[in-house]
A protein has these predicted regions:
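Active-site anion-handling motifs in enzyme catalytic cores
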Residues: 1-179
Length: 179
């Protein structure tokens, strides 16, 4: 990893809410390490389409603020909550740019590819659907029924069949079943 990083000119840390300590402290530390290592090895560092937070532990907040402030050359965020989290942590450099979540600006796959994926899961490619990608978090069990109600509403009001999309199967299937 470090050997490859040393041969790289631009390190892009991107997508998802990687900068958070809800799932674990270690994942936050790992991503902060990759950013620090990239900068130490001479790379330009960009955080692209990121979500920031929540970062609860005071030591993690200080560590994240220090690394981001010192090692990141450009940041684009996908939501205003992430911007507020950085401001609350005291991150003032680099300039933060609010942009669209990269997933909504990607071009769609060709229709035959989409149809094939749907059919491989037993889903009629000509139906009308609404997708839910749910991930459990502390307290999710108390909120899960809200997603189920939203799915019911979309079906009853608009005729959209809910499809639950497990992005990380080991976590997301359980969340979908709770909804």
């Amino acid at each position: 990893f470090l050997w490859r990083m040393g041969r790289t000119r631009l390190y892009i840390n991107g997508g998802g809410s990687l900068m958070q300590d809800v799932t674990s402290h270690r994942s936050l530390w790992f991503y902060l390490f990759t950013i620090s290592a990239a900068k130490a090895l001479g790379c330009q560092v960009m955080m692209y389409g990121c979500g920031i937070g929540p970062i609860h532990a005071p030591a993690n907040r200080r560590r994240a603020a220090k690394v981001l402030q010192k090692s990141v050359d450009a940041i684009t965020l996908r939501d205003t909550h992430s911007r507020a989290e950085l401001e609350d942590m005291g991150v003032t450099h680099p300039e933060v740019i609010l942009s669209a979540d990269p997933t909504v600006i990607l071009p769609a796959a060709p229709e035959p590819v989409i149809d094939g994926l749907l059919e491989s899961q037993g889903i009629d490619p000509h139906g009308r659907y609404i997708g839910f990608a749910l991930r459990p978090w502390p307290g999710f069990e108390q909120k899960a029924a809200v997603f189920g109600a939203a799915a019911d509403y979309a079906y009853e009001k608009y005729g959209l069949t809910p499809v639950f999309l497990p992005i990380e199967r080991r976590l997301d299937v359980g969340a979908a079943k709770l909804a």
